[in-house]
């Protein structure tokens, strides 16, 4: 089975509504979503039970992971291990593709 996703349309819709998260695919072992943050909205993520990867679609900011900060900009990819405290900061507008692996 295969799916195609219009990521730019999802991103545009979320940007127009001042941010949020929208799932574009969910299966037993994978979740893909688009996460848009618009200042002054805070990133209120809590640690997750699953590994997570981000691909920055647009914008720039900082990803703070367990006391380490990473400057991020369009095209960057990042990995966050399950259970790690993390959040985006220092952005005006930031759009990321989010990929969660699900444990068996």
Stretches found by the model and what they are:
Residues 48-63:
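Short, conserved beta-strand element in jelly-roll/cupin
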Residues 67-82:
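Short acidic-glycine-tyrosine-enriched beta hairpin
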Residues 28-31, 38-42, 60-62, 102-104:
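Short, charged/polar surface micro-motifs in flexible loops or helix N-caps
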Residues 82-104:
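Ligand-binding loop in jelly-roll beta-barrel domains
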Residues 57-58, 73-74, 92:
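A cytosolic small-molecule/anion-sensing beta-strand core signal
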Residues 28, 64-68, 91:
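Short strand-coil-strand connectors
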Residues 35, 54, 78:
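Conserved GNAT-family N-acetyltransferase fold
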Residues 1-34, 41-44:
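A short, N-terminal "cap"/entry segment at the start of jelly-roll beta-barrel domains
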């Amino acid at each position: 089975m295969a799916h195609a996703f219009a990521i730019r349309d999802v991103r545009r819709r979320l940007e127009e509504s001042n941010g949020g998260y929208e799932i574009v695919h969910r299966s037993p072992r994978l979740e893909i979503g688009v996460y848009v943050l618009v200042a002054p909205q805070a990133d209120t993520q809590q640690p997750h039970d699953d590994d997570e990867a981000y691909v920055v679609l647009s914008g720039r900011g900082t990803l703070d992971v367990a006391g380490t900060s990473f400057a991020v900009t369009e095209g960057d990819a990042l990995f966050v291990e399950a259970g790690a405290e993390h959040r985006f900061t220092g952005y005006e507008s930031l759009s990321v593709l989010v990929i969660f692996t699900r444990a068996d």
